[in-house]
Structure formats: structure tokens, C-alpha cells
């Protein structure tokens, strides 16, 4: 599934992501835009360390999810394949787990590059939140 920006914003708001970990809803949506282009089936198998990223939030198989390709910390206790389906509830739960670590949203390089310290005040302006 490819979400629209506003569709994802409403879904994340309903899941109490606005303010979660101290990050505004706009930060979460911005991160998803630049990590996956809002696509739940996004997959990146080209990380320098040989790891792969899965789904809407590009969660990594070294730390967050388990696949059959490598050993994993599997901190979200989930199979990576579950992060590629249209149900994003488990992706959201895992993202909440990621942001509880000391790095917070800086775990997502695309967020650091495109969203961190940017003026996101107008980013969701058209979404009728």
C-alpha cells in the first residue's frame, strides 16, 4: 500500500504518534516520506554493512526485525516480512520501540537529513488534522 501524506498522518495520529518520544506528527510523517515514499512494501537490501531495511519506516534486520538472512537483535520481536504488508500497526509499534533508544529519531538517517531541525509547521497544513 502506498499512503498519501494526509492518510498516513491521520493513521499515525489515531495511533497516538503525535508527540510520541517528544516528536511531532509532522516529524513521523516526514521520516516515512523520505524513508519509504509512504510505501509499505519498500525494501532496501543495499546497506553498507550487509543489512536490509523493511517497510514504511525502513526498519533494519540487524537491530529491529528478524529475517532468515542474518542474525538479529530483533528488538521489536517481529519477522521482517510482517513489516511489508498493508497492516502498519506492527510497524508503528516497532517505530515506537526504536525511538525509545537514546538516539531517538536520529536512528533514521533520512529523518536527520530531511526533517530534523527543519520548519515542518506547514508540512501537514492541508491535512485537516
UniProtKB/Swiss-Prot annotation:
Keywords (A to Z) from UniProt: Antimicrobial, Bacteriolytic enzyme, Calcium, Disulfide bond, Glycosidase, Hydrolase, Metal-binding
Positions annotated as active site in the UniProt record: 35, 53
GO molecular function terms noted in the UniProt entry: lysozyme activity; metal ion binding
The keyword Iron belongs to this UniProt entry's keyword annotation: no
Transmembrane regions listed in the UniProt entry: none
Cofactor note: Binds 1 Ca(2+) ion per subunit.
Known catalytic reactions: Hydrolysis of (1->4)-beta-linkages between N-acetylmuramic acid and N-acetyl-D-glucosamine residues in a peptidoglycan and between N-acetyl-D-glucosamine residues in chitodextrins
EC number(s) recorded for this UniProt protein: 3.2.1.17
Every C-type lysozyme domain range: 1-129
Residues binding Ca(2+): 82, 85, 87, 90-91
Any Pfam family: Lys
Cofactor(s) this protein cannot do without: Ca(2+)
Covalent S-S links between cysteines: 6-127, 30-115, 65-80, 76-94
InterPro entries reported in the protein's UniProt record: Glyco_hydro_22 (IPR001916), Glyco_hydro_22_CS (IPR019799), Glyco_hydro_22_lys (IPR000974), Lysozyme-like_dom_sf (IPR023346)
GO biological process: defense response to bacterium; killing of cells of another organism
Protein function: Lysozymes have primarily a bacteriolytic function; those in tissues and body fluids are associated with the monocyte-macrophage system and enhance the activity of immunoagents.
Complex formation: Monomer.
PANTHER family the UniProt entry points to: LYSOZYME C (PTHR11407), LYSOZYME C, MILK ISOZYME (PTHR11407:SF69)
Family under the similarity heading: Belongs to the glycosyl hydrolase 22 family.
Note: Lysozyme C is capable of both hydrolysis and transglycosylation; it also shows a slight esterase activity. It acts rapidly on both peptide-substituted and unsubstituted peptidoglycan, and slowly on chitin oligosaccharides.
Full protein name: Lysozyme C, milk isozyme
Encoding gene, per UniProt annotation: LYZ
